[in-house]
Amino acid sequence: MIEFYSWKNLLLKCRFERESLMMFAKVESQSNGIDLIKIDNEETKIVFTNYGARIVSWKYDDNNIVLGNVVEADEFYESNPYNFGATVGRYGGRIANATFELDSKKYELDANNGVHNIHGGPNGIDKRFFDYKIEEQVGQVKVIFTTTIQSADDHFPGDIDLEVIHTYNVDHKWTIEYKAKSTEKTLFNPMNHVYFNLNRDNNVIDNHSISSSKLDMYLLGEDNIVKSMEPLSLVNTFQEQNIQFKDIFDSEDAIVKEQMQRFGGIDHPFDIGGNEMTVENKHFILKVNTDMPNIVIYTFNDTTGWKSDFNIYKAHSGFTLETQCIPNDINLLGDQAPSILEANEPFYSKTSYKISEKQL
């Protein structure tokens, strides 16, 4: 008997068969304690490492859509100042003047970005080796990274037990989950500092477009610090919900122009009005979904600070989608800052990035 399938039934059948497949990871050890955890999913391949619980590579066919270095990871990442693909914390972004008050107590942090603290300070978790285990499952692989952030290391209150769970599935979706608990009331604002570039030729990302129901950009003052909690609506400014990076960089709007000229591009927190935003070019669509209140977009505006043969990058070689609380929220919002984590209160956050190829 011959079975006839509609296209819809065939697609459902193929999807069921794909999602029923076991997925596997392979570990490759390099020098300096770096392990590369490689997951192959037919059209796509993704690589993580225990150094900074970071993403190293994400290839669609032969096109690497993130910035990084697999072959020389043992040398590349320890010398790299740009946090490529790293888990950042305990606090992502800048804290102005490296100080904050919590319950009327003033905390002095290490200043590692001029007079400011950035990304948790010089002993941030992007620079450490995480313990990890791998769970190979039907339709996905989980890599569970664990560490403890000590107050003695970064001068924030409280020690934090942290799990960072990277999951990759058959639908080419990469999910990051953060689970944490602190011994004291503290600040906790983790994020991943992956740089994306969806161009097949690795050209600058000016041709990428961002879209969401709302694209409210918080303006920056001196030293890239958010100066006001009143953002600028790019949707209203450009009369578009789908806006190309190039149009933002070259805008004649007085406020946008001043910000772009001052900072060389975007390095701004956004309120996207919901949980999802999209970035696309003519080849790919990248969808990010998050439960965090803000997304910081950084378009890699200055690449001159790394004197190394590894530094092959120019301005706008990539862009970040850092899902987090707005940087410096503790000094902007005081005891209403969403980054405040109570003692022994479980923290959970989830962000996913899904890549798909456009059908031309």
Feature locations, PLM:
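An exposed, glycine/acidic-rich loop-and-rim segment of catalytic or binding clefts
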Residues: 7, 11-360
